């Protein structure tokens, strides 16, 4: 709907840290989305989020306009971001992807989505359904 967005898969501390380095280097206002699932295909142990450098996200300061969290383990992700130092007024939890997509589309800032594997599949399917477009593999 006109809001630029980019989706970057995160599934372990190393990959997540690379994504954080990239995002911190953008030096621009943005909305960030973290979707955390713990299904078999993701790996059921999400303790890796405590090893990932989400403090780098918090250090973005005023450029960090909003952080939306979603997925099966959204509450765990919210807690991790709180301990990383992200201002809690910037964190919003979405337990369903449809209102999350509405919020992303309403963002006046570029949206950077960081999902785990099954969250990526779920969210991509919902985005395609709501916004149109072909499936990724078509």
Question: Which role fits each region the language model picked out?
Answer:
Residues 1-138:
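ATP-dependent carboxylate-amine ligase
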């Amino acid at each position: 709907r006109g809001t630029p967005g980019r989706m970057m898969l995160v599934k372990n501390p190393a990959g997540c840290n690379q994504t954080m380095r990239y995002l911190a280097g953008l030096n621009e206002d943005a909305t960030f989305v973290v979707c955390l699932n713990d299904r078999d295909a993701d790996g059921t142990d999400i303790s890796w989020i405590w090893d990932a450098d989400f403090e780098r996200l918090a250090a973005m300061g005023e450029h960090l306009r909003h952080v939306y969290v979603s997925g099966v383990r959204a509450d765990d992700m919210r807690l991790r971001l709180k301990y990383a130092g992200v201002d809690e007024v910037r964190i919003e939890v979405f337990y369903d992807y449809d209102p999350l997509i509405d919020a992303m589309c309403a963002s006046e800032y570029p949206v950077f989505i960081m999902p785990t594997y099954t969250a990526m599949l779920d969210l991509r399917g919902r985005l395609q359904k709501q916004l149109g477009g072909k499936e990724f593999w078509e």
